């Protein structure tokens, strides 16, 4: 039996309502949904899954939540969000990993964020500002390396067919 749960931070109704220790006692595995750090209901733009946030929450699972590492499966995203700022409001749309490049205009500069372990792109179009924290093989590698660092049970992915062609070779390299 596996049970998927969100990160142990944030909303009392969304993520703080789970007793992960008890779930860990009765389930064979807990799948930590290591994504939606900034989701559809977020009031501000941000990454889907910064490596620093993922690691901090793995530590919470192991520490304050009391879940054994051998029971934790790290869920990782094969998607990101494009955030749109327009007249002071922020909205987002989900973009599959394999479609990210086609959603960023040619010539847009990307910059590496070393704490998030992600590239970031920002551009203007039609009077709106677009921001994207890029999920790709490089950003996913950092998250998968945490599986090894903390001796977790393994990794899971949301969701198949959203990934780029280079992902599975990297997954095999990191986790085998």
For each of these PLM feature ranges, what is it?
Residues 139-176:
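Acidic/aromatic/glycine-rich contiguous surface patches that form carbohydrate-binding/processing clefts
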Residues 76-146, 175-176:
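Glycan-binding loop/region signatures in secreted carbohydrate-active enzymes
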